[in-house]
A protein has these predicted regions:
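Hydrophobic cores of alpha-helical transmembrane segments in multi-pass integral membrane proteins
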Residues: 1, 7-57, 67-92, 106, ...
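Conserved P-loop NTPase catalytic core
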Residues: 62
Length: 359
């Protein structure tokens, strides 16, 4: 009963909104989350739940699969360092509100040490430790190089390396040109542009959240929810034929999920107006073109006249504003498209297979 409930809860249709809500609550109450007491209780409960879950053979097989173990370690480290950032940000924000300086600005923390031998010895020990760890890993876990690729046979499921699983999960909702080219380029450009977009001088060199709420919140949402969450889904919850499987569900190669995805043009002309699709491509896709145009070009101008938009323009200027809004809308297009697929089985806003252009 509990396992069936958790299997349904893990479905991205439910888990994605749930993770988004938890993300918002985490930063809203970051001073409570960023406490040692919270870490202790969270660790105890998580270990208890994980130990109970490991009694299930299907869950254990997924977790102990050699290719998945690094992702499990990644998740644990990610949770800890995310808590650590909130813990230090909470302390510094309280100190700043009290008129004190951040911990990183105290004389004890600003004390300088010699590169030799302090830094060099530390790096040497780290290299030795990592080498020993990797040697033991290679001996214990069987993950050898396989035979040369066979063009007549493909593994099922065929998964990309873990760092590309987020992109592979995006392929469920976008065409390859969008999920494999445009969105990765936007990610790279956004990361490069970020230091030049943010003119806020506060928060440099020390942990804080109160002084950089918008920047930290948007970046963390893109990193944790729109990237790490998709990697976790692709690693642990996508099985044969890229079908969703719950964490306690057996990977049945014959599982069939009935889906009937519909384009926006079909919604508009066939379902709403009860007529055939127009023969002209641009007339047929006119609803999707209008929706996409409003989203990409009208919303940035409309947001300019809001109080938040005016404040943003005063702080960073018009050029930075439009670049920032363009990148933000590109990032938000992913969760919007996911929600539209789940709620309305919407496949494409614009479907032009004649030009190999589907959006």
């Amino acid at each position: 009963m509990i396992k069936e409930f958790l299997n349904k809860l893990a479905d991205p249709i439910i888990s994605f909104p749930l993770v988004t809500i938890l993300f918002v609550l985490m930063y809203k109450y970051y001073r409570f989350v960023g406490t040692k007491k919270f870490l202790v209780w969270f660790s105890v409960i998580s270990l208890a739940v994980f130990g109970w879950a490991c009694t299930d053979p299907n869950f254990l097989a997924i977790i102990l699969w050699p290719d998945n173990i690094p992702i499990s370690i990644l998740v644990v480290m990610l949770v800890y360092f995310q808590w650590l950032s909130l813990y230090k940000a909470s302390i510094n924000d309280q100190r700043i509100e009290a008129g004190d300086v951040p911990i990183e600005a105290t004389p004890e923390e600003r004390e300088k040490v010699w590169c030799w031998p302090n830094l060099v010895y530390t790096e040497l020990f780290a290299i030795i430790g990592c080498t020993v760890f990797l040697v033991v890993w290679a001996i214990v876990f069987k993950a050898p190089l396989e035979e040369p690729a066979n063009p007549t046979w493909a593994p099922n499921p065929a998964k990309a390396p873990w760092y590309f699983l987020g992109l592979q999960e995006m392929l469920v909702y976008f065409d390859p040109w969008m999920a494999g080219v445009v969105l990765p380029v936007l990610i790279i450009v956004g990361l490069m542009a970020m230091p030049y977009m943010d003119t806020n001088p506060k928060g440099n060199g020390y942990y804080t959240f109160a002084e950089r709420k918008t920047a930290i919140f948007l970046w963390s949402y893109g990193w944790l929810v729109l990237w790490i969450f998709l990697i976790i889904v692709g690693t642990f919850l996508r099985g044969p034929n890229w079908t969703f499987y719950g964490p306690f569900e057996y990977w049945d190669f014959h599982k069939v999920v009935a889906e009937n995805n519909v384009n926006l043009s079909e919604f508009f002309w066939i379902k709403w107006f009860n007529t055939a699709l127009p023969s002209n491509i641009f007339v047929r896709e006119f609803p999707g073109i209008v929706v996409s145009g409003v989203y990409q070009f009208v919303l940035p101008y409309a947001f300019m006249f809001t109080n938040k938009g005016k404040e943003l323009i005063r702080g960073i200027g018009y050029i930075r504003y439009f670049i920032l809004i363009f990148l933000a809308l590109g990032m938000l297009s992913l969760p919007i498209k996911m929600v539209l697929r789940w709620l309305f089985s919407l496949k494409y806003l614009i479907a032009m297979p004649e030009f190999e252009l589907n959006l």
